[in-house]
Amino acid sequence: MSQLSLFTSQGHGEVVIDDTSGRIVHIADATDAVTAARWFDQLHAAVAWRADRRLMYDREVDVPRLLAHRSLNDPELPHSLRDALTLARRYEDARFNSIGLNLYRDGNDSVAPHNDKVAELVPNMPIVLLSLGATRQMVIRGKHPPHRRIVLDLRAGDILTMDWATQFHYDHGIPKTRDAVGPRISVAFRVRPSDGTWGSGRR
């Protein structure tokens, strides 16, 4: 793994993984605290959050977080998301067309270890994740021996970038915590196929 760091005018980026298995970069303080708080408040109030249920083994269970999805072609896209897109493109200049949002209401909300469904992504296009609200840990774990494990604290205003290849080699998730934590919103920018063949299990 490369131990190099990168510096930008918006924040300090740590190269977490950079090898044949993919590239992941964590940019702390990609935007300032005031802006991050404003975006959080606007999205928390304005987004039409939904509670989903999913089949697990032989029964349906509640998804332990609230979800939403917006298209970048939506003329009513909140200004905060357009501004966040501009920020995301400072780090990955891709033609993002999809925004997935998750609201973790407290420490009981989580997302299990997973990789993004590669069939629902344009090959070789990056994913950019923006964190807003409370700090939560993300656990990144290698799919193959020795199952490398990386834990990152994602704070308000942080960005995490992942390239396409990492989805084949690593899972990522937000575990539950017993700590008293406030709500957190994650904003995920992706490049989806234009043929409409995606849509199940959006995160």
Please report, for each region that a protein language model flagged, where it lies by residue.
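Non-heme Fe(II) oxygenase metal-center motifs and adjacent flexible, charged/small-residue loops
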Residues: 1-203
